[in-house]
Amino acid sequence: EWNKPEDVKKVIVKLYKKDKLEGVVFVGDIPIPMLRKAQHMTSAFKMDEKNNDWRDSSVPSDRFYDDFDLQFDFLKQDSVENNFFYYNLAIKSPQQIRCDIYSARVKAVDNGEEPHAQISRYFKKVVAEHQINNKLDQFFSYTGDGSYSNSLTAWTPETFTIREQMPGVFDKEGRARFIRYNFSDYPKDDVINMLKRTDLDLSIFHEHGMPERQYLSGSPATNRWNAHVDAMKYYYRGLARRKQNNKKSFDEMLDMMKNTYGLDTTWIAGYDDPKVIAEDSLLDLRTGIILSEVTEFKPNSRMVIFDACYNGDFREKDYIAGRYIMSEGKCVTTFANSVNVLQDKMANEMLGLL
């Protein structure tokens, strides 16, 4: 029985040497290495390990398993979440990642369905997809609010790089689709409708994210004074709710509103009214995709790449990337990050190698 990551890695290395193992898929609750002293090998995750909780300041990573050269010093097993094992990257270890094999996880999510039933359905649809001769010729890319610092200059070249990397998707009109967060006030429905397409092969999301949410868009641009006012009130109500449990912080917010912008408390009126809270919550929901919605709309894109923070955080019982593959749709593969990822970069570099 595999009680700790070392047990799993020992089997992997043995198979690699004996049978030239190319990769592994971890099915179920395989021990999760929680890595520390290795933030220099992440693109954006930077958190003080001394003054923050171990769970939050460690990186869940299977590089422990698939990069045989990396060396680690065992620290402890989590006393509450027993599947977590904490390690420091050893001083004598290589300080760069060069994986010897590929690795992936098939992990049930907390959607109310029995875990074994989820995994069984997943493998059935994987087998079904492998039996179909389906070439990659339908592509979709979405760029959310905040990605590339909202630069049109940085966003525009994606069409040219995709054309070079996957020329087949440009053979006919409509095979490659690109949507940006400001194409409409709330592009969420357009994105979901795209993901529901039964012919969609590959999708990429450039966005902000959390384990439980894809952040698609922000507050829509306004061009009339009454819309400006409504947008500002919506923003300050949200700010007030975030600070209401800290009197000092709340008072500082009121001072800032008054002394910097000349705004009185009428601009946050209703921030603690249940009716207004519900209305604001529904408006906020239009700007992103949450876990339950993934299960509802059943994404069919065969592969989805999440160029986003935390959408692939497999230490959680439920997370966006897991919901995609465990849905009843045809999605069978996701590529996502377990922690923060750098936004301002060429995210599609070498994508054509797939």
Predicted feature locations:
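Cysteine-dependent hydrolase recognition
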Residues: 1-354
